[in-house]
From Swiss-Prot:
UniProt-listed Enzyme Commission number(s): 3.1.26.4
PROSITE patterns assigned to the protein according to its UniProt record, in alphabetical order: RNASE_H_2
Lineage per the UniProt record: Bacteria, Bacillati, Bacillota, Bacilli, Bacillales
Domain of life of the organism encoding this protein: Bacteria
Cofactor stoichiometry and binding remark: Manganese or magnesium. Binds 1 divalent metal ion per monomer in the absence of substrate. May bind a second metal ion after substrate binding.
Protein's name according to its UniProt entry: Ribonuclease HIII
Species of provenance: Oceanobacillus iheyensis (strain DSM 14371 / CIP 107618 / JCM 11309 / KCTC 3954 / HTE831)
Keyword Transferase: no
This protein's record includes keyword Metal-binding: yes
Gene name tied to this protein: rnhC
Amino acid sequence: MSQQVIVTTKEQIQKMKKYYLSQLTSTPQGAIFRAKTNNAVITAYQSGKVLFQGSAPESEASKWGNVPLNDKKKHSLEQKHSYSPQAELFTDNHIGSDEAGTGDYFGPITVAALFATKEQQLKLKQIGVRDSKHLNDTKIKQIAKEIAHLQIPYSLLLLPNGKYNKLQAKGWSQGKMKAMLHHHAIDKLLQKIDVRSLKGIVIDQFCQPPVYKKYLQSEKKTLHPNTTFITKAESHSISVAAASILARARFVNAMDELSEEAKMELPKGASAKVDQTAARLIRSKGFEELDKYAKTHFANTQKAQKLL
């Protein structure tokens, strides 16, 4: 299990507690709060130390700074390791891959991988491709259509909730599901391109590279050559940023489809509003049907049941 520690102020810890309100669990002695997300278990202590432990603690910690205060110079390219990309790769011909839907109770997980040459990267920038976190759903859908019109090679995978829940019941962590989705998306994309022009692969890092490799090895797969990992990859690589938009657009469309099928709007995220909607859905369709709409191992399921 990986871990990440940050040191912050008590004011920031209170903001964090409010942010994780719907995911709080029992608080251990000496702690201010403990919360459990799909990426990590977060424990905040009176000393100001916040510990993130789980399959992707870096991803969760990055929301709050990701590194101890006054230590950011060590992270000029985020967390450096033997699988870190060289800066020049970001402007060369490369594949980028990213996912969406992992922290959302309702809806699937989607993963996209996209290959862009130097020339295509310029076109992607011209149509407004950038970090999808700074774009609303309407803009994401629009740019995703424009990416498709550019005929830039990509692959897009969707893991529906029913399959997600079956894998989770078999003992798969979400980290393993994401690793296999990234691997298969890249596999499919490699079949569409001339690999001789490929200089490398950039994956938006959600776990340590050795952990990612173990996930692949457990399914008798191996890491693709020249694969690199970096956190916040979409802010470095236009290929990852474009893949992120494609994955997010597919997730948003899937949420629209599920909402129409459920005959109620299914909110994104994992907030108290999600708990209330899940309770309504259970009343309307029965608990068994929840499997088609939600990641049922999330704490929201138990919270929804308490509202019935």
